[in-house]
Curated annotation (Swiss-Prot):
This is Phospho-N-acetylmuramoyl-pentapeptide-transferase. It is found in: Cell inner membrane. It comes from Afipia carboxidovorans (strain ATCC 49405 / DSM 1227 / KCTC 32145 / OM5) (Oligotropha carboxidovorans). It holds the Pfam family MraY_sig1. The gene is mraY. Its EC number is 2.7.8.13. Belongs to the glycosyltransferase 4 family. MraY subfamily. GO terms for molecular function: metal ion binding; phospho-N-acetylmuramoyl-pentapeptide-transferase activity; UDP-N-acetylmuramoyl-L-alanyl-D-glutamyl-meso-2,6-diaminopimelyl-D-alanyl-D-alanine:undecaprenyl-phosphate transferase activity. The chain crosses the membrane at residues 27-47, 72-92, 94-114, 133-153, 169-189, 200-220, 240-260, 264-284, 289-309, 338-358. Keywords: Cell cycle, Cell division, Cell inner membrane, Cell membrane, Cell shape, Cell wall biogenesis/degradation, Magnesium, Membrane, Metal-binding, Peptidoglycan synthesis, Transferase, Transmembrane, Transmembrane helix. It is a multi-pass membrane protein.
Length: 361
């Protein structure tokens, strides 16, 4: 919305600053943080009142969770999504199709997660939304998003898969790219969802990934920088940095309330939405494989569940004491703050490794 003020650049001194993505990204970050700080307590109070017993705690999980987390409200993702939407509407260029497609994925996945949280809270069960139906809905949202991204790209090379460290090599996936892109988006959403099991564990790596992809989006969307770095230029994607800034701000605000002991949980409302958002940005900026590096922590968490389930079905034995992997370390005696902070450190290192692919070609 503020971007439209640039039309008055000739009449109001200084108004031209709203043209700059970097300025608007900073504005979105501050707005997102302030929104969550101001309205967070009100949202938490209303969710606690509406939910009563709060999020059901796994009986087969670490015993300490039954004592420290019982009664904590969930659906905290509503705080993040509200801050994100308000910030984006204020600071982003709303004529940009990439802004709308990423918002669509974020809110679509957020709605799926909200319904899942609603079923869990009202029925006090972990069953929630049917797994297959949930994946089907997510898949349809992701497929539509990929169609819009292909349309916005306006040339066939948008269906090429870039390879990190290779400046002149890409794999032409053709229309199979639709399926591949949808897999990336759905996979990212559910990987973040699996990571969200300890206070503060998911939100900081999400913010790290958002900051990383905000930088990538800015560089990919800038013809000069993309030529210098020899990465593919995708016109218009620089605007996605504003959304990443909004997530950073809203995430900081949420972390204030989610820091241990958490006053509220993100829930599927937040984890699915934020994962889907990062996945859709990765697809839009043509750095799908780099997502597996920057979001390596999420990949590791998801793989631990896949390996655990496959091993138990095939051999009757479990590889980990408990999955996802963060619960395995809890069972080994690591404290919750140890796990969370160490995983944050891993997320930072992976983000740096992913960003290095921009220069090492």
């Amino acid at each position: 919305m503020f971007y439209w003020l640039t039309e008055l650049a000739g009449t109001i001194p200084g108004i031209n600053v709203f043209r700059y993505i970097t300025f608007r990204t900073g504005g979105a970050m501050v707005t997102g943080a302030l929104f969550v700080f101001l309205f967070g307590p009100w949202i938490i109070d209303h969710l606690r009142l509406a939910q009563g017993k709060g999020q059901p705690i796994r009986a087969d999980g670490p015993p300490t969770h039954l004592m420290t987390k019982k009664g904590t409200p969930t659906m905290g993702g509503l705080m993040i999504l509200s801050g994100l939407v308000v910030s984006t509407l204020l600071w982003a260029n709303l004529h940009n199709p990439y802004v709308w497609v990423v918002l669509m994925v974020t809110l679509g996945f957020g709605f799926v997660g909200f319904y899942d949280d609603y079923l869990k809270v009202t029925k006090q069960t972990h069953a929630g939304f049917s797994g297959r139906l949930r994946l089907a809905v997510e898949g349809l949202i992701a497929l539509f998003a990929c169609l819009v991204i292909i349309w916005a790209g306006r040339d066939s090379s948008v269906m090429h898969l870039g390879i990190p460290f290779a400046k002149d090599f890409a794999i032409n996936l053709g229309w199979f790219y639709l399926v591949f892109g949808a897999f990336i988006i759905v996979g990212a959403g559910n990987a973040v969802n699996l990571t969200d099991g300890l206070d503060g564990l998911a939100i900081v790596p999400v913010m790290i990934a958002a900051a990383s992809f905000g930088m990538i989006a800015y560089l990919v969307g800038n013809a000069v920088f993309s030529e210098y770095l020899q990465i593919r230029y995708v016109a218009g994607t620089g605007e996605l940095a504003v959304l990443c800034g909004a997530v950073l701000g809203a995430g900081l605000g949420f972390l204030w309330f989610n820091a241990p002991p958490a006053s509220i949980f993100m829930g599927d409302t937040g984890s699915l939405a934020l994962g889907g958002m990062i996945g859709s940005i990765a697809v839009a900026v043509k750095h799908e494989i780099v997502l597996a590096v920057i979001g390596g922590l999420f990949v590791f968490e998801a793989l631990s569940v896949i390996v655990q389930v496959a091993s138990f079905k095939l051999t009757g034995k479990r590889i980990f004491r408990m999955a996802p992997i963060h619960h395995h370390y809890e069972q080994k005696g690591w404290t919750e703050p140890q796990i969370v902070i160490r995983f944050w450190i891993i997320a930072v290192m992976l983000a740096l490794a992913g960003l290095s692919t921009l220069k090492l070609r």
